[in-house]
Amino acid sequence: MSAKTGTSKTLYEKVYDAHVAVAAEGENPILYIDRHLVHEVTSPQAFDGLREKGRKVRQIGKTFATMDHNVSTQTKDINASGEMARIQMETLAKNCKEFGVTLYDLNHKYQGIVHVIGPELGITLPGMTIVCGDSHTATHGAFGSLAFGIGTSEVEHVLATQTLKQSLAKTMKIEVVGKVAEGITAKDIVLAIIGKTTAAGGTGYVVEFCGEAITDLTMEGRMTVCNMAIELGAKAGLIAPDQTTYDYIKDRKFSPTGANFDAAVEYWSTLKTDDGATFDAVVTLDAKNIKPQVTWGTNPGQVIAIDELIPGPDNFSEQVDKTSAEKALAYMGLEAGKKLSDFDIDKVFIGSCTNSRIEDMRAAAAIAKGRKVAANVQALVVPGSEQVKAQAEKEGLDKIFIEAGFEWRLPGCSMCLAMNNDRLGPKERCASTSNRNFEGRQGRDGRTHLVSPAMAAAAACAGHFVDIRDLDNATA
């Protein structure tokens, strides 16, 4: 079905309607896809499918590939992450060469995590439809684009046709009213949102994030929020573009220039929800109540403020939540009624498509400066791209991290997921700036706590979680 034809539309409905290529009676509409981002893990079978059917990539100018999931963060050696990783990366290189697709490979100055390089290169622009064979494609929605993850068969379909069948989703508005307190980050905001909606609260919806606390965010902060839209079950998350967006986009490699940029801004400024447009669901949070957040369980909705006690089954009314809490506490090795700061951590991971941009590096370095990583902790800082790495090194952030005892690594997805050499051992506890704390996500039987970069850096130095609002006391 197509979006409503009335005068008042949501941002999502405007972008969706603008991309309907074919709307046959009784069928899901076919959407045109503006950008297709490709990486080494979900693309091999898709290219094989093209080859078997004698097809070409329809729009090589709108298709961009990189290596990120499997890459080693310690060396540029393609063999370093094992045989499967090597095969996937070599296959991507072969496929991109054969089909004429732009590839930012291991040794390219633009290599990095796909959801970091898209925005920083100006590949991502407002009002676009953007897909990738990766669940955190929602990141690009920070620009007011409709961005979502797709499966491998859909990757093949987009490569071949530059289109995708897509039904219209339900709409949800999540408004964060007012201003956050000092030191509260985009990561804290989105974790607080998921804590309220639960990890399934957005299922079947496309979410628009709005409110003063959202528009106050930088583009990098907005990307963190939209990145985790999938973690409340949503198909995608969008934020309306504004002057902050246009200033970020200007002068990037693939951004429009001159009169074309001015014309683009004129169009982009129409990409906002109309007065009178209705949403299927509305969620409201008061920004001033948001504190530094830490997950305690095995989904991102199992989250508390750092100064709260770990909940137990008795804190929940629904039996399914009681059972889930009991199981999560057992897996995480936690005890209800205690504080998260009572438990030592083993590893810290600052990186991922959620929090590996230059502002994240700066926030972590500000905490690390003049401090030392605790003796019981291994702490990794993994920039999201070669561009982020170069900028951080230009600012001397790498030296701050190394001096404090952090490991300064090469760009890649790293310890977000156990697909390379960066992973947790059984029962190791990790403060992570990534987006998923599922069982085994960072390594078999590993225990993941999701936090902001500042909270992760503080935990690394203290050896356990601390409230960054009390930081002077925390490192004494």
UniProtKB/Swiss-Prot annotation:
Task: From the UniProt annotation, give the residues forming the signal peptide.
Answer: none
Per its UniProt record, the required cofactor names are: [4Fe-4S] cluster
Cite the binding residues for [4Fe-4S] cluster.
353, 413, 416
One protein family per Pfam: Aconitase
GO molecular function terms here? 3-isopropylmalate dehydratase activity; 4 iron, 4 sulfur cluster binding; metal ion binding
Q: Could you give the cofactor binding note from the entry? A: Binds 1 [4Fe-4S] cluster per subunit.
The pathway it acts in is: Amino-acid biosynthesis; L-leucine biosynthesis; L-leucine from 3-methyl-2-oxobutanoate: step 2/4
What reaction is this protein's catalytic activity?
A: (2R,3S)-3-isopropylmalate = (2S)-2-isopropylmalate
Record protein name field: 3-isopropylmalate dehydratase large subunit
Provide this UniProt record's keywords sorted from A to Z: 4Fe-4S, Amino-acid biosynthesis, Branched-chain amino acid biosynthesis, Iron, Iron-sulfur, Leucine biosynthesis, Lyase, Metal-binding
Q: Name one GO biological process term.
A: L-leucine biosynthetic process
Question: What EC identifiers does the entry list?
Answer: 4.2.1.33
Name the job this protein performs.
Catalyzes the isomerization between 2-isopropylmalate and 3-isopropylmalate, via the formation of 2-isopropylmaleate.
Sorted alphabetically, which SUPFAM superfamilies does this protein's record hold? Aconitase iron-sulfur domain
Please name the InterPro entries in this protein's record.
Answer: 3-IsopropMal_deHydase_lsu, Acnase/IPM_dHydase_lsu_aba_1/3, Acoase/IPM_deHydtase_lsu_aba, Aconitase_4Fe-4S_BS, Aconitase_4Fe-4S_dom, IPM_dehydratase_rel_enz, IPMI_cat
Indicate the quaternary assembly. Heterodimer of LeuC and LeuD.
Keyword Lyase present in the record's keywords: the answer is yes
Family, per the entry? Belongs to the aconitase/IPM isomerase family. LeuC type 1 subfamily.
